[in-house]
Every structure is written in C-alpha cells, then in structure tokens.
Amino acid sequence: MPNSWVDVDKALDYLARSDTLPHRAEGEGVLVRDLAGCLPGRVLDLGCGDGRLTALVLAAYPESTAICIDMSPAMLDAVTERFADDDRVTIATHDLEDPLPFDGPFNRPFNAVISSLAIHHVDDERKRTLYAEIVALLTPGGVFANLEIVRSPTQALHDRWRDEMGARDDPSDRLAPMEPQLGWLRDAGLHDVDCIWKWRALALLRGTKPRPGPSM
C-alpha cells in the first residue's frame, strides 16, 4: 500500500496546521532541554517534516550538526528551504518503513536521535525494529527522544484528544499505547527510559544508550 504522505496536498495541509497543535511547543521545549547532556554533537531527525524540531535543537546547541530525513516531497521541499543557507544540516530522502541506513553520512554514531509526530505512522513490528536500529546508530551516552502521539487508554479520551486537536483520525496512524513502547525501548537496549512529558495523547518518550561498564 503506497504511503499516503507522498500526497502533496496531505503534507501541505499538515504543515499548515502543525504550528498550532495544542501544547506541542511545550513538549518540544522539554525535549530540547533533555538533550543537554549529549549535545553539542551529531543529530538525526527521523521524519523531520519541515525541520521545525531540528531548528529548535540547533538554536539551543548551535555547534551541533544534523541530518534530516523524510520521504514526503512536500516536507523535503519545506526542510530544504528552511535550511538552504545552513551548512550544519544535511537532508536525505528516506522512508521509515525501510531499515535506517548505516553508510554515507550515517556511518558515524549520532549523539542524539530525535523525532516528532512521525513514528506513529509505522506498525508496531516496525516500531520495534526501528528502535533497535536507532540504538545501533547512537553513540554510548547518546539520547533518543520522540515526541509522539500514543494510543489513549479509552475511546472517550481519544475522542476528546481529537476534538481538542481539531482533527479527524488519519487512516495512516498506527498508534500504540505508551507503556508497551517504553518496554520496546528498553528491549532495544536503552536505559533511563521514561515518558518525561505528556499532554493527553501527545507524549515525550526518551532513553539513553548506556556507556560501557568498567572492565573486570
């Protein structure tokens, strides 16, 4: 089934609404501050959209560099325009349904892997394999931080979330509950896994790749 985010009209409609999503900026602020222990350094933004989150991270940690990946032509046009004069940013086309690359600009570890409102578009099996790939790309001590839509515990809470968002359900959504996702992050090898901020179905999930312990 083709990925619906290649549809230019759908992507442009999302971009027109995305800056007004309730409490998004609050969650982004918590995410940016959570990276203080691992940046400046190399950042990978998964499903970067128009580059909004990368721009916030680079504003806070200006000595960092970033690779932004997305598969939507409209999103790639928007992020390319945003960073046209910023040589700290590399932009690449990649579908999160496919395994993350480990060659070219991806052949060195990242200090942080970030994502916002993207990973919920892949199914649960792919989420789990993606988390393992993220851990493999992180340097020891690196952080994965994901500001994500999670499945609400009840339909009533889900309906209220959608009402406050002013949006309908998207057939491309593959929402998973928060608690299993925290477990998948631990299973992938991350430590200090937690949900460190949440507003209704919008949750900030994070974990740190452990550093090697002392040799015996």
Predicted regions and their residues:
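Conserved class I S-adenosyl-L-methionine
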Residues: 1-38
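Short conserved loop adjoining the S-adenosyl-L-methionine
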Residues: 98-107
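A conserved beta-strand element that flanks and buttresses the S-adenosyl-L-methionine
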Residues: 114
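Core SAM-dependent methyltransferase catalytic element
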Residues: 194-216
